From Swiss-Prot:
This is Ribulose bisphosphate carboxylase large chain. The gene is rbcL. RuBisCO catalyzes two reactions: the carboxylation of D-ribulose 1,5-bisphosphate, the primary event in carbon dioxide fixation, as well as the oxidative fragmentation of the pentose substrate in the photorespiration process. Both reactions occur simultaneously and in competition at the same active site. Keywords: Calvin cycle, Carbon dioxide fixation, Chloroplast, Disulfide bond, Lyase, Magnesium, Metal-binding, Methylation, Monooxygenase, Oxidoreductase, Photorespiration, Photosynthesis, Plastid. One of its GO terms (biological process) is reductive pentose-phosphate cycle. It comes from Oxalis dillenii.
Length: 466
């Protein structure tokens, strides 16, 4: 007789272990599972645990050569989703040894690599991950983090201001640099390459880097403040990306940028290491995130992508606005904003946080609010995001009727007015419009901006609900 029982057996016999007590070193995952009709929750949950760890569809004799008990993922808890008959949350624990140290790429390949195409489930969404300190400690994380960035820039006690240069495609390098200079001179801290600006025929990367560096140094000398422009180093190969980052360092600029989802985690982690070694800040754009996170019952929630970025490394990341054209749901957005900035975040299901997350000493990431925001949103943004954030106004700067520099002035005046009002104890949520109106009496630039955008709102139902 053979030494193992051949054939197909139910996953739940091996991978559903409700009595399992999770270890401090386990990586924990919360999946929203929509099973095929007729598949019981325990079997579907166990199937997810199996397919994302040691399992395959049939028993194999080589199982006898290893200790499955030591290496298997376990579905240890199942709970219903309120209001959704056909869905449930499956909690899965993965032993730490299943993952390569310091590789977000490997973590994702294991946890979400194969199982999402799996037949026993109709749809699957990874809602959250608990990353144990034992694993976090194998990552460098953000190149610098929030405090070091403030010290480098000498900017304290307020959110930072940015602006994406528009039109995003089509400007020549010289005109692009001019737009950068105008915004920085007017009072912004940063300007930004759009995520799709890499190195196209109308503007090659080296020319853009040169003219933007000139704009940075000229505006710095005129304003006496430290300025930056997120130079997008994203490229078709890792080698080319690093080459661009090296050139940025040689120019002496403070910050570069990367599209971490389209560029990939391997490239992103390499760039983050380079940035820490060479004193560059790293701005992260999340282009392509909605492909992964927008569907409510399939994909991976953005809070998972945000945690992954904090491990891979970045000093800023776009995180939705709560107001404006890319509206996130407020509590959920604030949940992952805290996961980006804080050292320790308590489990809180009302904010979509499924696990208590202890980041130990990993530096924090500044959330960037960007997309359809303008001066009238400033009080709400200051109130919601607090000091440790970057508020980015693209059209909200360049669309000011008098031009870029006055548009930048308007944003800076509005921000300073909001910060002062808050520090004086006024309620930004209630008195926001009044605060902006008062400030505009002293600033014609702000008054002009207020006039243009007095009625603009982008109002759609949020897609993401708990």
């Amino acid at each position: 007789s053979v030494g193992f029982k051949a054939g197909v057996k139910d996953y739940k016999l091996t991978y559903y272990t409700p009595e399992y007590e999770t270890k401090d070193t386990d990586i924990l995952a919360a999946f929203r599972v929509t099973p095929q009709p007729g598949v019981p929750p325990e079997e579907a949950g166990a199937a997810v645990a199996a397919e994302s760890s040691t399992g395959t569809w049939t028993t194999v004799w080589t199982d006898g050569l290893t200790s499955l008990d030591r290496y298997k993922g376990r579905c240890y808890h199942i709970e219903p989703v309120p209001g959704e008959e056909s869905q449930f949350i499956a909690y899965v624990a993965y032993p730490l040894d299943l993952f390569e140290e310091g590789s977000v790429t490997n973590m994702f390949t294991s946890i979400v690599g194969n199982v999402f195409g799996f037949n026993a489930v109709r749809a699957l969404r990874l809602e959250d991950l608990r990353i144990p300190p034992a694993y976090t400690k194998t990552f460098q994380g953000p190149p610098h983090g929030i405090q070091v960035e403030r010290d480098k820039l000498n900017k304290y006690g307020r959110p930072l201001l940015g602006c994406t240069i528009k039109p995003k495609l089509g400007l020549s390098a010289k005109n692009y640099g001019r737009a950068v200079y105008e915004c920085l001179r007017g009072g912004l801290d940063f300007t930004k390459d759009d995520e799709n600006v890499n190195s196209q025929p109308f503007m090659r990367w080296r020319d853009r880097f040169l003219f933007c560096a000139e704009a940075i140094f000229k505006s710095q000398s005129e304003t006496g403040e430290i300025k930056g422009h997120y130079l997008n180093a994203t490229a078709g190969t890792c080698e080319e990306m690093i080459k661009r980052a090296v050139f940025a360092r040689e120019l002496g600029v403070p910050i570069v940028m990367h599209d971490y989802l389209t560029g990939g985690f391997t490239a992103n982690t390499s760039l983050a290491h380079y940035c820490r070694d060479n004193g560059l800040l790293l701005h992260i754009h999340r282009a392509m995130h909605a492909v992964i996170d927008r569907q409510k019952n399939h994909g991976x929630h953005f809070r998972v992508l945000a945690k992954a970025l904090r491990m891979s490394g970045g000093d800023h990341i776009h995180s939705g606005t709560v107001v404006g054209k890319l509206e996130g749901e407020r509590e959920i957005t604030l949940g992952f904003v805290d996961l980006l900035r804080d050292d320790f975040v308590e489990k809180d299901r009302s904010r979509g946080i499924f696990f208590t997350q202890d980041w130990v000493s990993l530096p924090g990431v500044l959330p960037v609010a960007s997309g359809g925001i303008h001066v009238w949103h400033m009080p709400a943004l200051t109130e919601i995001f607090g000091d440790d954030s970057v508020l980015q106004f693209g059209g909200g700067t360049l669309g000011x009727p008098w031009g870029n520099x006055p548009g930048a002035v308007a944003n800076r005046v509005a921000l300073e007015a909001c910060v002062q009002a808050r520090n004086e104890g006024r309620d930004l949520a209630r008195e926001g419009n009044e605060i902006i109106r008062e400030a505009s009496k002293w600033s014609p630039e702000l008054a002009a901006a207020c006039e243009v955008w007095k009625e603009i709102k982008f109002e759609f139902e949020p897609v993401d609900t708990i």
